[in-house]
Structure formats: structure tokens, C-alpha cells
Amino acid sequence: MAIDVSNQNDDLVKVVVDVDPVPTDFERWAKPGHFSRSLSKGPLTTTWIWNLHADVHDFDGYSTNLQDISRKIFSAHFGQLGIIFIWLSGMYFHGARFSNYEAWLSNPAKIKPSAQVVWPIVGQDILNGDVGDGFRGVQITSGLFHVWRASGITNELELFSTAIGGLVMAFLMFFAGWFHYHKAAPKLQWFQNAESMLNHHLSGLLGLGSLSWAGHQIHIAIPINKLLDKGVSASEIPLPHEFLVDKTQMINIFPSFEKGLTPFFTLNWKEYSDFLTFQGGLDPQTGSLWLTDIAHHHLAIAVLFIVAGHMYKTNWSIGHRLKEILEGHKVLSVSKGHSGLYEIFTTSWHAQLSLNLAMLGSLSIIVAHHMYAMPPYPYISVDYATQLSLFTHHMWIGGFCIVGAGAHASIFMVRDYNPADNYNNLLDRIICQRDAIISHLNWACIFLGLHSFGLYIHNDTMSALGRSDDMFSDTAIQLQPIFSQFIQRIHYMTIESTAPYVSHGTSPAWGGDIVAINGKIAMMPISLGTSDFMVHHIHAFTIHVTVLILLKGVLFSRNSRLIPDKSNLGFRFPCDGPGRGGTCQVSAWDHVFLGLFWMYNSLSIVIFHFSWKLQSDVWGNVNSSVVSHITRGNFAQSANTINGWLRDFLWSQSSQVIQSYGSSLSAYGLIFLGAHFVWAFSLMFLFSGRGYWQELIESIVWAHNKLKVAPAIAPRALSITQGRAVGVAHYLLGGIGTTWSFFLARIISVN
């Protein structure tokens, strides 16, 4: 049987590069704006510097060569990784040089982590608070100490070594970024080979990465943690490599190591259940997930992802073509299904980035919610300041990524979308139905907003009139979250039937016993009531409004009834003018601008809810079976009115930051004050128009001309878009700084 291999060979994946495509030239670095024909002419007005910052990374704004754009993005990724490695190296160096890590290891439940000691130049050493065991420094809330313990680091030398390793990796990343742009740059077809990319990312990054971490945990981290849990001093624990070369060290901790690989090859895997466990719940000694459960999880994940890395067809006869999967997705044959989407994601990096940002942002929010209910690192659950910081951090990261997804989806629609190539496919049909989608989503927002705020306004009114029996509360008119309670109940009750070998559910948050360390609550069942029901509908309202703004921006980014030729105006433009009133703030960029404010609204309420709820109903102490929470359970009684949120959360809990002056928390008081100023400063840009500032500038320039000190670069007021960008940046920076200082001063004081 003859086989024609000519076409098959054409389909083979080849790694193709251009050698020495772009010479290394440092002279261009000295010429700001060299990448743009207009900017390279130099500044005539002050607008030039703003345009320089706005456009410097807009690779496809000054080039239409997709291959060159792809190479620049690829190279920039290595640069980003290099910066991350330097940052991480700095964290580890601080841990080695300036921290109380070894003291913290000896008593992590009582001693607070610190890795920064402020120098006494003119009294700044007031910031060095007593974190325990005689160490004075700034308390940190990054969770790094807990990660280091979980990974088996026991001394400063190991931290130093890792810091040096981080710098070596940073150098390799910077070198790779230069090498793959200037010396051996991949061709476009390499960037567009989705199957190979997915296979390598699934098997390599996720599969082998998880396998490596599982191996590290089993052979090094868990044995060291077992010894620490038994009270062995960190200085007496064998060095990591000793567990690898001396088998008796491992056999003393895990007897199954004596049997070697025999149980593996004879499929008698249960023999390994001493280090690959399936216990569920939290370790009562450390308040974290069982490290042996985590190792088991990573081993299972590794197997799944290594298999998943063989799903997509490349040079071998197994797997599927992504294009065929997408084009085969025809539902009831009413449309072309997903045809055209493969071409979109392999030619528009904005479309691909949008999808990735939406997924990564959602994942970050999922991480935030898992990390407090299922704390992964030893003793992190009783470090309330770290728990609050990490929840807030992951929520913010998720919010910014999701807004970024909307931004890049809009850029794709404006710059990369071709209607002729997408006729009657999934995307086209969504665009055709955009009026129905947006109008219904708008109705949902109005419904949620009016009803959820209506409940609060009713309660505030009844409270003011002294009619507490007519309020929505757990003690009067109840609005119990029955569906949430049902989900909690089944997660707690059905463990015996769904996972008979597990001793506990995934988290005590579902129900069961309190997990406490030295009398301090790590996690316990979280009761939900009327106040939770009410604020959850505020969450639903703000999230839906954020989605409405971003989705409207995407679906109407090319055209609308108001501006049919919007795609010709680009991603960002102030108005469709001059001469057309009522067409301002309709660009896709403006939707991102507005979406950022609503994202801020959404997340502020989420992190406020989290902070108050856990202080009220979870965090605290257990003494002789008597549970005492930080705010003594006042969430249920107070969080059902707007006045309650203002009085018993914002005002009551801000006392620590307001009264922090003269203490080690005084920096938070100054940040609280300064961040309020930054936030207020933003309103100057958001409320006033460009003309006001241009008139003012011209008066100031007139005065300079009189004194013959007029600048060569003519001052110009910010454009409308630039003003909004500066405004939203300061609004968010001020808001985040205010919240950060408010949270930390409060939680460090009561932790």
C-alpha cells in the first residue's frame, strides 16, 4: 500500500527561526520615541511625553508585521520574568538578611513574621514594632514565611542560596529575551502553532511542574515539616540533600520507603499511604491542609496534565486538531458554530490575551476564596493579617485582569476583527443579538440594584423609627440564604457517601468542629444569615454592572446606532466631533475607564464583607470551649443597615489607623492620610474640563513670557482621554492605599 507523505510532511511541526534578524543597537535607546514616526521628531508640546508613555508598548500601533509584533511580545515576556525573578530574589534576600525567620520557625503561632528593619535616621525606627522573642521590625503579611516552612527551608543559608539562584534565573531570562529577538527569533508559524503550545504548557509547565513540586514535597519538604511538628529544633534537622542520599532518614519518617519502588510496579500503591494521604480537612497542629494530602494532590494533578499534554495533534498520529474541535462545535446546525475562532486566536494576540486574562482573573478570585477556607501553608490560618492581605491581594489582581480582558477584547474588535471572515459564526451571532443581551443585562442590574439597596433603605428607615420588629434580620423578618445553606450542608453531610475514605470534608467552613491552635481559631463553621443574603445581592448588583459596562464596550466597539463608523475612530477617542454633541465617552477605552470604577466598587464591598464577617464570626479565641470572636458576632445584627456598615465597620474599625500616630503603626496613619489626598486629587482630573486648564496654562505662560523664561516645549493641557486616565489611576491608587492602611492597622492591632 503506497502512502503519500507529501501533504503529511507539510503538516509536520518544525521549529524555524531567523538567525540574526535584528542587530543589537544601543544608540536607539538614547532617542526617545524611536519606535514612532511622529514621536521620534521630539517634543514640541508637553503632550509628547504623555503620548510617549501611552504608546510605548502599543506594538501593533506602529507596526503591521505580525511576526515582528509576536517576537517583541515574546521577548518582553522574558524581560517580565527576569524582573519577577529579581523581585523574588529580593524577597528571599530580605528573609535571609533582615528577618526573624529562624525565631518564627521555633514558635510560628506566637511570633509574628518580620523581614524589614527600618534604619534610625531621624526617628523612623519607631516603625520597628515588637513582633515577639525580642525582635523589632516591620510585620510583613505576604505569607512568605509560611511558604518557606511548607517548602522545607529551615535556615538563612538556604534563603541566601535561593536568592542567588533567583538572580541567576533573572540573568538567564534577560539573556533569553535578547537571544530570541536579536540572535534566533522564531518565525510566525511557531507562534501560531497552538497544538504544540498547549501540549508543552499542559505536560511541561503544569504536568512536570506539579510532578516536580510533589517530588520536592515528598523527599524534602514533608520530612522536614514532620520533624518541625515533633518539636525538633530547626538547627538539628538534617540538610535537604541528606534526605536524598541517606535512605534511613526517610525510612524513620515514612516506613514505606524501605520497600522502594516495588509497590509502584506491583500496583500495590496503598503501601505509599503514609506519605500520599487522603485525609481531608485541616491538620489540627498547623491549621493548614495536610501536606501529605497536598503532595498526593500534586501527584494526581501531574498525571492528569501529562496525559492532557497529549491531547492535541502535532507530528504523531494521536490527538486532535484544535481547528477541527472548534469547527465541529455546531449546535443543532443553526449556525457555523465556532468556525473562524481558530483563525481569530492564532492571528489576534489581543483576542488570545483577552481570553487568558479573563481565565487568570477568575482563577485569582477562586484562589482568594480557597486560601482562607482551605489554608495551604502551616500556621498561615492563625496569622489573620496575612489572611486578610492575601484575600484582598488576590481579589484586586482578579479584578484588574478581568477588566483587562474587556480592554483587549475591545482592541481585538476594533483592530483585528474582520466581519467578512466571521459571517454567521458564534461571534457574529452574539454581535447580532447585542441589543437583546445588553438590554436584558441592564434590566438585571436595575432589578438587583433597586431591590438590594431597597432592603437596606427599608432597614435603615425602620431602625431610625425604632421599629426593629419590622426589619429584615435573623431576629425579625428573616431572609435566610437557603441555597447557600443547602450547599454548605451537602458539602458537610455527604462526605461519608461521596468520599468514604476521607475523615473530614474539604474545609471546616462547611460545618463540623472548630480548628484552633493554642486557643486561636484557624477555621470553623461559617454561619450565613440575613445580613449575608443582603450583601451578597449587593455583590451580584455591582458585578453585573461591571460586566454590563465591559460587555457593552466590547459589543459596541466597532459601531452603534449613535456612531455607525466607530471602528474608524479607533480604540480610544474623546468624542465623534467636532459638531456632534452627545457622542463623548463612547469609545471602547471609555468603557474600560468606567469599568475600572465599578470593579473598584465591586471589590471594595467584597473585601469589606470578608474582613468584617471573619472578624465577627470566625477569627478569635477558644477558652474552655467558650468562643470569643474579635467583634463578638456583631455582623448579623449590624450589617443589615447602611448605617451599621458605616458605624460598626468603617468608623469603629478605623480607630486603630486614626490613632496610630506615635506607634509602630504610624506609617499606616500617614498612608491613610496621604492616600485620601491622592484619591481626592483624582477628582480634580475627573470633574473639570480640558478648557479650564488650557485657559489657566495660557495665563501662566503669559507671565513666563513677561519674565522671558518661557519654556521651549509649549505647555498643553491634558487631552480629555489623558485626563481621565490620570484621574482613574489616582482614584484607584488612593482607594487601594486607603483600604490597605485601614485594614492592616486594624488587623495587626487585634491579631
Swiss-Prot record:
- UniProt GO MF annotations: 4 iron, 4 sulfur cluster binding; chlorophyll binding; electron transfer activity; magnesium ion binding; oxidoreductase activity
The record's subcellular locations are: Plastid, Chloroplast thylakoid membrane
Give yes or no: UniProt keyword Transport.
Answer: yes
Membrane-traversing stretches: 73-96, 159-182, 198-222, 294-312, 349-372, 388-414, 436-458, 533-551, 591-612, 665-687, 725-745
A Pfam family that this protein carries is PsaA_PsaB
**Topology with regard to the membrane?**
Multi-pass membrane protein
Write out the residues that bind phylloquinone: 693
UniProt-listed PROSITE patterns: PHOTOSYSTEM_I_PSAAB (PS00419)
Name the catalysed reactions. Answer: reduced [plastocyanin] + hnu + oxidized [2Fe-2S]-[ferredoxin] = oxidized [plastocyanin] + reduced [2Fe-2S]-[ferredoxin]
Q: Per the annotation, how and in what number is the cofactor bound?
A: P700 is a chlorophyll a/chlorophyll a' dimer, A0 is one or more chlorophyll a, A1 is one or both phylloquinones and FX is a shared 4Fe-4S iron-sulfur center.
Record key words, sorted: 4Fe-4S, Chlorophyll, Chloroplast, Chromophore, Electron transport, Iron, Iron-sulfur, Magnesium, Membrane, Metal-binding, Oxidoreductase, Photosynthesis, Photosystem I, Plastid, Thylakoid, Transmembrane, Transmembrane helix, Transport
One GO BP annotation here?
Answer: photosynthesis
Binding, [4Fe-4S] cluster: 575, 584
Q: What is its EC number?
A: 1.97.1.12
Binding of chlorophyll a, residues? 684, 692
| Keyword Transit peptide assigned | no
Name the SUPFAM superfamilies on file: Photosystem I subunits PsaA/PsaB (SSF81558)
- Would you identify the family this protein belongs to, as annotated? Belongs to the PsaA/PsaB family.
According to the record's subunit comment, the protein's assembly and interactions are:
The PsaA/B heterodimer binds the P700 chlorophyll special pair and subsequent electron acceptors. PSI consists of a core antenna complex that captures photons, and an electron transfer chain that converts photonic excitation into a charge separation. The eukaryotic PSI reaction center is composed of at least 11 subunits.
Q: Give the matching PANTHER family.
A: OUTER MEMBRANE PROTEIN, OMPA-RELATED, PHOTOSYSTEM I P700 CHLOROPHYLL A APOPROTEIN A1-RELATED
What the protein does?
PsaA and PsaB bind P700, the primary electron donor of photosystem I (PSI), as well as the electron acceptors A0, A1 and FX. PSI is a plastocyanin/cytochrome c6-ferredoxin oxidoreductase, converting photonic excitation into a charge separation, which transfers an electron from the donor P700 chlorophyll pair to the spectroscopically characterized acceptors A0, A1, FX, FA and FB in turn. Oxidized P700 is reduced on the lumenal side of the thylakoid membrane by plastocyanin or cytochrome c6.
Question: What's this protein's name?
Answer: Photosystem I P700 chlorophyll a apoprotein A1
The record lists the organism as Bigelowiella natans (Pedinomonas minutissima)
